[in-house]
A protein has these predicted regions:
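Active-site-adjacent structural elements in enzyme catalytic cores
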Residues: 1-358
Length: 358
């Protein structure tokens, strides 16, 4: 089915004031509510990336997400909620004190928790798993939409599956125009990478996907050991982002690991190619001092920010990759950054996006 996709911007003033009650009164939200309750899709902003939402209790509606994105149906979706009453309706378990502390600390925010699901959640949403990832986003437009529909919203990133996640409404329009009826615009996403997904066990917290909440932040709250789980290609994914290739633009991405001689040799041997170098401020300054920049009009230099401000780098990453994908670059070379804090989430995305290392 082809849609005439509408993009409606929510007033910035209401978003900045976090005025959920006024946002819910907007005609755009009422339109979005009608779409959701009639089994249609609505794209909306969160603090991480834009989400493509459907009623998580309606299997037919959720199937439309997989179709619009071209997403494999064994890749589970996260159920987004707006309050703890909804949380109690979507899970079938009692939470312990440690998990309660984690939820109270990081919700609303970029943290998803895997728990046994209730019968309310469609098995299409969970890819036939008996567990569901649950998250309470902090963006006022997301919370307004979830509250006004009184439905948990299944919502992966609102993009074509495999491409960089959308951090602006126009990114959603680029990918999904004609495939969905409505996009709610809410400005640029503050975090810029998806939520952290965790599974809490008796003695440990398993990070299934690094994201907007770092392992260091989790360690400050919980005494449990924190470990990272990587999914093999043959295993059924417990959470989004574990099995399939993600986050990659159509232009080839190479990862620069700091080997200067290898980089210099590559640039020299490929001086006729149109290249984009996405480097940190420190590396750009160092190369300038050594006069190692190749004076070549085919090379575009993008400063992604300082290694001392990894949150800023995370915020820009998907936006930069999408913008460079619109240019005539043959290769995008992105510098590896420290895997601490949110840098772990950034590198998780870059490892998946890159086809080669330098």
């Amino acid at each position: 089915m082809n849609y005439k996709t509408s993009l409606i911007e929510i007033p910035k003033a209401l978003i900045q004031k976090n005025n959920i009650e006024q946002i819910k009164k907007l005609s755009a939200l009422k339109k979005a509510k009608n779409h959701i309750l009639s089994g249609e899709l609505v794209a909306f902003p969160t603090e991480t990336v834009y989400g493509l939402g459907a009623d998580a209790t309606n299997g037919k509606a959720v199937k439309k997400i997989f179709k619009a994105k071209g997403r494999p149906q064994d890749n589970p979706l996260i159920a987004h909620i707006a309050n703890l009453d909804q949380f109690e309706r979507v899970v079938d378990t009692k939470i312990d004190n440690d998990l309660e502390k984690i939820i109270n600390t990081f919700w609303p925010g970029p943290l998803t928790v895997i728990l046994p699901k209730s019968n309310l959640i469609s098995k299409i949403t969970t890819a036939n798993l008996d567990t569901v990832g649950v998250r309470m986003p902090s963006h006022p437009v997301a919370l307004s939409l979830i509250e006004i529909t009184d439905r948990p919203l299944a919502a992966p990133s609102a993009n074509t599956s495999g491409l960089p996640s959308p951090t602006r409404a126009e990114h959603v329009l680029d990918d999904l125009k004609g495939k969905i009826p409505l996009i709610l615009g809410g400005g640029a996403c503050k975090v810029g990478v998806e939520s952290t997904i965790i599974k809490v066990e008796k003695e440990k917290i398993i990070i299934l996907r690094p994201g907007g909440i770092s392992r260091e932040e989790l360690a400050k709250i919980s005494e449990r050991k924190i470990v990272r789980k990587n999914n093999s290609k043959n295993n059924k994914p417990l959470a989004p982002g574990m099995k399939y290739k993600h986050y990659s633009p159509e232009t080839k991405v190479f990862l620069y690991t700091g080997k200067k001689e290898k980089l210099h040799r590559y640039l020299k041997n490929n001086e006729n190619k149109k290249l984009a170098l996405v480097f940190t401020s420190e590396t750009i300054d160092e190369l300038k001092k050594r006069n190692e920049f190749v004076k070549n009009k085919n090379i575009k230099i993008i400063d992604i920010g300082s290694k001392t401000d990894l949150k800023s780098i995370a915020n820009k990453l998907f936006y930069i990759l999408r913008e460079l994908d619109k240019s005539e670059n043959e290769i995008i070379i992105v510098e590896k950054i420290p895997e601490r804090g949110i840098g772990e989430a950034v590198m998780n995305r870059l490892y998946k996006a890159a086809s080669e290392k330098l």
